[in-house]
């Protein structure tokens, strides 16, 4: 298999998350487009959208190593939908969000955050030396 994977652990249990395939990336965008019709100001719908889209992304990732894979014949979408329901019913929202983030990293959908050590001048966003428009004068 060509897909990258990463172990996700929580409360002594673990699952393997997989990178999304090219087809799954397309299906994810199509799924987001279907859910896109959230009205502005409808916070309940926005929260529901966020949880469902995260669970769907995680379900697509889990599908590669899930016992349901291949159980519906050629209907992978039905298998992913069952896994999505399982995720939404048994996972806390914090874990769904963490898994979604890891899948997006594995799949190259977001760039990894790189923590670079900063010098004391950069920490405060202040220049190391004062900048002026004047030419430096010779030292007397």
Curated annotation (Swiss-Prot):
Cell compartments where the protein resides: Host cytoplasm
Keywords, comma-separated and alphabetical: Host cytoplasm, Late protein, Viral release from host cell, Viral tail assembly
GO cellular component, one term: host cell cytoplasm
Tree of life domain: Viruses
The UniProt record lists the keyword RNA-binding: no
GO biological process: viral tail assembly; viral translational frameshifting
The keyword Iron belongs to this UniProt entry's keyword annotation: no
Region (Disordered): 114-140
InterPro entries: Tail_assembly_G (IPR010027), Tail_assembly_GT (IPR043704)
Family: Belongs to the lambda-like tail assembly protein family.
Record function comment: Promotes tail assembly by creating a scaffold for the tail tube proteins. Tail assembly proteins G and GT probably wrap the linear tape measure protein to create a tail assembly scaffold. This allows the polymerization of the tail tube protein, during which G and GT are released, therefore they are absent in the mature virion. The tail assembly protein GT is produced by a rare -1 ribosomal frameshift. The ratio of translated G/GT is about 20, and this ratio is important for proper tail assembly.
Subunit structure: Interacts with the tail assembly protein GT and the tape measure protein.
Protein name: Tail assembly protein G
Originating organism: Escherichia phage N15 (Bacteriophage N15)
Gene this chain is encoded by: gene 14
